[in-house]
């Protein structure tokens, strides 16, 4: 009897919406500016003490962009300090934090 190996299901990017919800404070305003500059397809909603960023398909937070807006070095892990909630699958490196849903084809 021979067993055939099956390849894992291919993953494709989804167009389902993702979001980030961050505390509204002086530091996150610069982070939000960087996010909206890098994600022109995103929409921003301001609430008391919170800012929610929605985007169809994906949302990316780039370290270099945030550093430019903050005017200092910034570690992607610092995003978690002000993170309230999110939706989507997370891909995180030293250079970016990416949200997107992955559907199996």
What are these regions (language model features)?
Residues 2-7, 36-40, 84:
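Short amphipathic beta-strand starts and helix->beta connectors
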Residues 2-32, 49-69:
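Conserved N-terminal glycine/acidic-rich loop preference
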Residues 33-41, 68, 72:
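Short, intrinsically disordered, mixed-charge
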Residues 47-50, 55-105:
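Helix-rich interaction surfaces within compact, conserved domain-sized segments
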């Amino acid at each position: 009897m021979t067993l055939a190996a099956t390849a894992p299901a291919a993953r494709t990017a989804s167009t389902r919406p993702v979001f980030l919800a961050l505390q509204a404070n002086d530091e996150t305003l610069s982070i939000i500016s960087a996010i909206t500059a890098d994600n022109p397809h995103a929409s921003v909603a301001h609430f008391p003490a919170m800012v929610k960023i929605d985007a169809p398909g994906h949302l990316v937070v780039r370290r270099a962009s945030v550093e430019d807006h903050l005017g200092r070095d910034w570690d992607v892990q610092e995003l978690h300090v002000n993170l309230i909630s999110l939706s989507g699958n997370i891909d995180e490196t030293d250079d970016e934090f990416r949200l997107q849903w992955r559907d199996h084809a």
